[in-house]
Regions:
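Beta-rich catalytic cores
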Residues: 40, 76-79, 126, 154, ...
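Residue-level detector of Asp-centered blade-edge/turn motifs that repeat once per structural unit
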Residues: 46-49, 85-87, 132-135, 182-185, ...
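Beta-propeller domain segments
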Residues: 127, 145-147, 161-164, 176-177, ...
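Residue position within the beta-strands of beta-propeller blades
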Residues: 53-54, 92, 139-141, 189-192, ...
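Beta-strand-rich domains and repeat architectures in extracellular enzymes and scaffolds
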Residues: 35-58, 250-257, 267
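A short loop-to-beta-strand structural motif that recurs across blades of beta-propeller domains
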Residues: 59-61, 97-99, 157-159, 206, ...
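Blade-edge beta-strand/turn elements of extracellular beta-propeller
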Residues: 29-37, 67-76, 103-121, 151-180, ...
Length: 332
């Protein structure tokens, strides 16, 4: 496998033939470039010719997809991890609220309005993911506040609401910490991070299919494995098992189905901290057959700590890296 260094100092391992080019590297049919520097970059939203980027800090950034520096588009948040756009508006999911903006020319944001306040305290799992479903509702994740414990209220759930913040509904529960979901047709798939401190190889990270109102096992199960402290406790409902297991501790976060990949998905694996030999730190291609995931293979490696993946209008792959404070674009 060839090793190449970009000008930005990030290393890429080509999975096929690799040819160096002046402004980046070619990975088979793709070319890797640094699109912009964004501090602690997290979820991304492609909104016309602007890429909005949530962060772990206090600001949301706007990046011109045609090239140029990122600029601070809005501030005054507490960890505005989640961003999504619909009908000319941007929605920002932070620790304690959902905020809506009107998107103006050049990606300016106007008319700031909190549409939902008082979100549950999710402790160390307070990085909300947000997306607009095929039904035009907003879907938001609410992590559990712990490694393994009984969540309360909306902790450990995924919920949906109207775009004005009304009609909040719990659509999934028993979810430890989902920081990524997307739709394949009308079917929603979501990642979920497995528990820590149970060993190098258990429990797995999960990929699940949303069944409205379904129970996904936490804190009783991680995959099909009983979790520490709840081995003999009777679960409150029948568990909906994962449709695919990722390796334990890879920290599977953002997932996106790509038109340019024939309906396959890319998944950002943020990387382990609770394992003797580190795993993850890559983007994998999740291949589907007959509507079901069958394998996950490395697509991009050594791209820092990838958080989210999105498809630009031209089919390019966008990757956010919160550790390196960067957005990368992989052009065909």
């Amino acid at each position: 496998m060839d090793v190449i260094f970009l000008k930005a100092g990030i290393r890429f391992l080509g999975l096929a033939a690799v040819a160096t080019v002046a402004s980046g590297v070619a990975l088979g049919p793709a070319r890797a470039e640094l699109l912009a520097r964004v501090p602690a970059a997290r979820e991304m939203a492609v909104c016309g010719d602007t890429l909005f980027v949530g962060t772990k800090g206090s600001s949301v950034y706007a990046v011109p997809l045609s090239g140029g520096r990122a600029r601070r588009a809005a501030s005054g948040f507490s960890a505005p991890n989640g961003v999504a756009c619909s009908r000319g508006r941007l929605f920002v999911a932070s620790r304690d609220r959902i905020t809506a903006f009107e998107i103006g020319r050049g990606g300016t944001l106007n008319g700031r309005r909190d549409i939902r306040r008082g979100l549950p305290n999710s402790g160390g799992h307070s990085f909300r993911y947000i997306a607009v479903g095929p039904d035009s509702r907003l879907y938001v994740s609410f992590g559990s506040p712990c490694n393994i414990c009984l969540p309360r209220g909306l902790q450990g759930t995924i919920a949906s609401m109207n775009q004005d913040g009304s009609d909040l509904r719990r659509v999934a529960w028993g979810v430890r910490n989902s920081v990524g979901f997307d739709w394949r047709g009308s079917t929603m798939f979501f990642t979920d991070n497995g528990a820590d401190r149970m060993g190098d190889d258990i429990p797995p990270d999960e990929l699940n299919v949303l069944r409205q109102g379904g129970f996904y096992g936490f804190p009783y199960f991680g995959g099909r494995i009983r979790l520490t402290g709840f081995e003999d406790a009777p679960p409150p409902a029948r568990q909906i098992a994962p449709v695919f297991n990722f390796q334990a501790h890879v920290a599977a976060l953002g997932i996106h189905f790509f038109r340019s990949l024939g309906g396959d998905a890319l998944v950002a694996q943020h990387g382990s901290w609770d394992r003797s030999v580190p795993v993850g730190y890559q983007v994998v291609r999740l291949s589907f057959r007959g509507g079901r995931p069958v394998s996950a293979t490395p697509f991009l490696r050594d791209v820092g700590r990838p958080v989210d993946v999105k498809e630009a209008l031209d089919g390019s792959v966008l990757v956010s890296d919160d550790a390196g404070g960067a957005i990368y674009v992989f052009r065909r």
